Amino acid sequence: MTEERNQRKVYQGRVVSDKMDKTITVVVETKKNHPIYGKRMKYSKKYKAHDENNTAKVGDIVKIMETRPLSATKRFRLLEVVEEAVII
């Protein structure tokens, strides 16, 4: 069981929305080579993740893991809050 879970995708990103109950929106930024020119391009993708205890807040750096479909758009769950946001 644990070996299978280790093959699931794990991403690290920043929480941009926590307005939904038990759901957060995480932006994951990655770099990819352009297919023709070879330049490293930065791109980002938003994922909705399940946050059972509503622990993550906007601005936090979190780790999310791929899981079974939890709703029409949720395919990830919160693993841990790596770094909490600094409130000014």
Curated annotation (Swiss-Prot):
At the top level of its lineage, which domain of life is listed? Bacteria
Q: Which GO terms describe its cellular component?
A: cytosolic small ribosomal subunit
Its annotated function is as follows: One of the primary rRNA binding proteins, it binds specifically to the 5'-end of 16S ribosomal RNA.
Q: Name one Pfam family in it.
A: Ribosomal_S17
What is the protein's given name? Small ribosomal subunit protein uS17
Question: What does the sequence similarity comment in the record state about its family?
Answer: Belongs to the universal ribosomal protein uS17 family.
Is this entry keyworded Metal-binding? no
One annotated GO molecular function: rRNA binding
The UniProt entry's GO biological process terms, in alphabetical order, are: translation
Q: Does the keyword Thylakoid apply?
A: no
The UniProt keywords, alphabetically, are: Ribonucleoprotein, Ribosomal protein, RNA-binding, rRNA-binding
Q: What is the lineage of its organism?
A: Bacteria, Bacillati, Bacillota, Bacilli, Lactobacillales
The organism of origin for this protein: Enterococcus faecalis (strain ATCC 700802 / V583)
SUPFAM superfamilies per record: Nucleic acid-binding proteins
What gene codes for this chain? Answer: rpsQ
PANTHER family for this protein: 40S RIBOSOMAL PROTEIN S11 FAMILY MEMBER, SMALL RIBOSOMAL SUBUNIT PROTEIN US17M
Q: List the disulfide bonds.
A: none
How is the quaternary structure described?
Answer: Part of the 30S ribosomal subunit.
